[in-house]
C-alpha cells in the first residue's frame, strides 16, 4: 500500500518564475534583483566598508555554488546556508538582520503565488483518494 507520494515542487507542481509577470505588473523588480538588493543592503548596513559591487559578487559566487549543488549534486541548500556562504566570502558571519533577510528571501516565493503546472489541479485531488 502506498503511504506517501512526494513531488519536486518547482517545474513539477508549479511553474518556476511564473510569478515574475505579476511582479512586473505591480512595478516590482524581479526576484533576482530584489534578493541582490536585500543582501547588499544588509551587508552595507553592518559593514559599510564593503562595496556594493563586492557584496553582489560574493552573493553571485554563492548562488553559482548553489546552482551546482542543485543541478549536479541534486541537493537544495536552504536559503540560510546560501546567505551564510555569501557572507563568508566577504569574511563575515551572520549579521544582526540575518534572520529577517532569510525570511524575506523565503517569503518572496509565496507572496505572489506561482502558477500550477498543467494538470496539477486535477491530479492532486485524484491522488488523495
Q: What do the predicted segments below correspond to?
A:
Residues 2-117:
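N-terminal helical cap/lid subdomain that shapes the substrate entry/recognition surface
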Residues 119-129:
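Catalytic-core regions built around general acid/base machinery
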